Amino acid sequence: RLKKGDVPKDLDRLEAQILKTTSGIARGPRGYLSLINRVKPLIQAGEVVVVTGDFNEPSHQDWTQAAAKRGMDRWVKNTSGRPLRFKVAWAGSVALEKVGLSDAYRTRFPDEIKKPGNTWTPPYPDGLPGRQPYHHQVLDRIDRIHFTGVHLRVLDAAVVGEDKRICEIAHSGPWVSDHRAVVATFEFTGSAEKLSNPKNDRNKSKGTKY
């Protein structure tokens, strides 16, 4: 709709339409609910859980009300006359948060305006087979690391890619993927025994980095 110049005035209604249209992602066999059903018992048992991947959906922690007012225009070449930035409480990331999984990048960089952390998609020349022109792309952070664990702490997180101006870590050679990579450093503040048996708190240690 936006590419055709159909810019809605009621953004709350647009958000509802987007969530309805994308609801199948969460319910699908490779979607969020399948993941949550597998990790929820581990989380409830107090286990350390780290989940990472290409989620094929943005995060509600990026599409915030603040970003809607002051954030970047996500459309590479916007021809609509209105910035592509509005609030959307994306259902998948909301569901992960509700089950107790935190976003490593947003834990390290809570300001979604200064640090958008986009992983989709690095620039590429027009005419590549199977890819639309780059100026049609919408930039977003769809590759993420989520974690939980009372003894797990984020020390650092980064996007890895082709340009230091965009990424915390720049690759020295050609970047051939259509996604940027993500990495995080964690500290386990408990003992090795807690890592294998999180309900046993008898031993203490200064912490281990992973």
Which positions does each model-derived feature cover?
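Active-site regions of metal-assisted phosphoester/phosphodiester hydrolases
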Residues: R1-Y210
